[in-house]
Regions:
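Membrane topogenic/interface segments and analogous intrinsically disordered interaction regions
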Residues: 1-269
Length: 269
């Protein structure tokens, strides 16, 4: 009897009289989902530690022909193992986190919004992976080869780098290109919301290109080839974003009309 009373009290805390979830219920659901994501992250890090040596091998495969890797500080090698394992844990957690974000927001979304939300998360994940793969397969090998052998002279200088510097460069490039490849998706979202339009993107393209090259100069080694290799894809993606903005741009009036039509359809159902 006492157990049934406790269950009813807990249910009353979570669900309101009209069947909707209370603030306490939402907070409990959010807490549970955060705990699940945290557990997945911890498990991912622990499992990745067992394969940290293989992960380091994958990273260093791009530069082994051009560099000799050394560990300068006593803790340097161990710290890179931890860094790579933590990054692998994040990679494993991101799809799970995306799912729980969608599941948490789904009750408050319309059918069309729910479908668009799922599409955005899926495309975002795919584009980020494509950006990282582009950096790993194309950009990084060329950059490492150029930085090592592109300048003639001083042949007595050995091309040696610390494992920390190398891992820093790799992870920085992966994150940059992963984020840069999200540009078309961000443009689609903002254009669909009516915040930006193709005319605006065309007007500011000169400023945008200057900013792109400035960012490339900050995040890459100080040589023009590396800067152009980073800035080139960013400029190309910017012009692709202009094209996509022209397809998906909708003024606010159109969005309001669509919302009204969706509401009418739901009332009829």
């Amino acid at each position: 009897m006492a157990t049934n009373v406790k269950r009813k009290k807990k249910k009353a805390e979570v669900m309101a009289e009209d069947g909707s979830m209370t603030l306490t219920g939402h907070l409990k659901e959010l807490r549970n989902r955060l705990i699940i994501c945290a557990v997945v992250f911890v498990v991912g890090v622990v499992v990745s530690l067992a394969y940290a040596d293989r992960l380091i091998d994958v990273l260093t495969a791009m530069g082994r022909d051009y560099y000799e890797f050394v560990s300068i500080a006593p803790q340097e090698k161990l710290m890179q193992y931890f860094r790579v394992s933590i990054l692998a844990g994040v990679v494993v957690t991101v799809p799970v986190a995306f799912y729980h974000i969608y599941a948490f927001a789904k009750p408050g979304l319309k059918r069309s919004e729910s479908a668009f939300f799922k599409l955005v998360m899926l495309l975002g994940l795919i584009l980020f992976c494509v950006g990282v793969l582009f950096a790993y397969k194309l950009m990084m090998p060329f950059m490492l080869r150029f930085l090592s052998t592109g300048i003639n002279g001083a042949e007595y200088i050995q091309t040696t780098t610390s494992i920390e510097s190398y891992v820093n460069l790799c992870l920085t490039m992966f994150i940059i290109f992963g984020c840069v490849f999200e540009m078309p998706l961000i443009t689609i979202i903002l254009s669909k919301m009516g915040i930006i339009n193709p005319q605006l993107l065309k007007q500011v393209r000169g400023v945008a290109i200057v900013i792109i090259f400035f960012i490339a100069a900050v995040v890459t080694p100080p040589d023009i080839v590396s800067q152009c290799m980073v800035a080139g894809p960013m400029v190309l993606l910017y012009f692709i974003s202009i094209f996509l903005s022209g397809i998906f741009y909708k003024p606010h009036e159109d969005d309001d009309d669509e919302d009204d039509e969706d509401d009418e359809d739901e009332e009829e159902e």
